[in-house]
Regions:
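Short, conserved structural patches
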Residues: 2-3, 52-135
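Alpha-helical assembly-interface signal, strongest on the long, hydrophobic N-terminal helix that forms
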Residues: 2-72
């Protein structure tokens, strides 16, 4: 009985190494995926905050497009995000709602998946709308 138990343990010695070799790439892929999803979520949150700050500035002051774009770039630069496009739509004087719209776009660079030779970018966009506060 003792001899068969010892031979069973010796015959299963390499199983842990083989199982680890099979599971490790999957663990790496999952951890890289979680990291990239977190980075994309953070970038989207930064774009939303930048659009919100820009539309706040445009809503409480006279809609000055260069000033709004500068404010949006300031928020994005603080978080090391490079916006590819900033669109400011001033309020229409004939519209009773007088809404101001700011849209910010950026390309998200996928970093971790370069191991799999995917070097693409994912376009992200955030839009904020507020009513212009004027008398």
């Amino acid at each position: 009985m003792a001899r068969s138990l010892i031979s069973f343990v010796r015959s299963n010695r390499g199983n842990a190494v083989v199982e680890f070799a099979l599971v490790f790439p999957l663990l790496l892929l999952v951890s890289f995926g979680i990291t990239e999803f977190g980075r994309a979520w953070m970038t989207m949150n930064i774009l939303t905050s930048a659009a919100r700050e820009g539309v706040r500035l445009a809503a409480v002051t006279a809609p000055n497009v260069p000033a709004v774009e500068a404010r949006v770039r300031e928020v994005c630069d603080a978080a090391n995000v490079d916006p590819t496009a900033i669109a400011v739509v001033p309020p229409d004087p004939m519209d009773p709602d007088r809404r101001v719209t700011v849209t910010v776009q950026a390309d998200f660079q996928v970093f971790s998946v370069r191991i799999l030779d995917f070097r693409g970018t994912i376009p992200l966009s955030a839009t904020s709308v507020m009513r212009h506060e004027s008398l």
